[in-house]
Amino acid sequence: MARKPKESSTVDFETTLNQLETIVTRLEAGDLPLEEALKEFENGIKLAKLGQERLQQAEQRIQILLQKSDTAELTDYQPTDE
C-alpha cells in the first residue's frame, strides 16, 4: 500500500529523504501494480517538494546568520580532544 508523507511541520529533512528513497526503490523494482505505482509516484513528488522546501529554509537561515555575523571573522573549527 502507498505510504502518505507525514505533515510537513513534523517531518525533518532526513526522514523525508529516507521516505523518498524507499519510494524510489519500490518504483525501480517494477513489482508494483500500476495504481499503486502511481500513488507512490505522487507521494514521491510531494516528498521531493517538501525536501526542497526544507533545503530552502535551511539556506535562508544560513543567509540570515551570515548577515548577522557579517562583521565577525570566521575561523577554522578546532576540535577539542576529550
Curated annotation (Swiss-Prot):
A Gene Ontology term for the protein's cellular component: exodeoxyribonuclease VII complex
Signal peptide range: none
Coiled coil ranges: none
Subcellular compartments: Cytoplasm
Keywords, comma-separated and alphabetical: Cytoplasm, Exonuclease, Hydrolase, Nuclease
Record-linked InterPro entries: Exonuc_VII_S, Exonuc_VII_ssu_sf
GO biological process: DNA catabolic process
The protein's Enzyme Commission number: 3.1.11.6
Protein origin, superkingdom: Bacteria
GO MF, any single term: exodeoxyribonuclease VII activity
Gene3D superfamilies noted in UniProt: Exonuclease VII, small subunit (1.10.287.1040)
Presence of keyword Endoplasmic reticulum: no
UniProt KW ATP-binding keyword: no
Catalytic activity reported: Exonucleolytic cleavage in either 5'- to 3'- or 3'- to 5'-direction to yield nucleoside 5'-phosphates
SUPFAM superfamilies: XseB-like
Family: Belongs to the XseB family.
Described purpose of this protein according to its UniProt entry: Bidirectionally degrades single-stranded DNA into large acid-insoluble oligonucleotides, which are then degraded further into small acid-soluble oligonucleotides.
Subunit structure: Heterooligomer composed of large and small subunits.
Alphabetized PANTHER family for the sequence: EXODEOXYRIBONUCLEASE 7 SMALL SUBUNIT
Name under which the protein is recorded: Exodeoxyribonuclease 7 small subunit
Organism of provenance: Mannheimia succiniciproducens (strain KCTC 0769BP / MBEL55E)
Record gene name: xseB
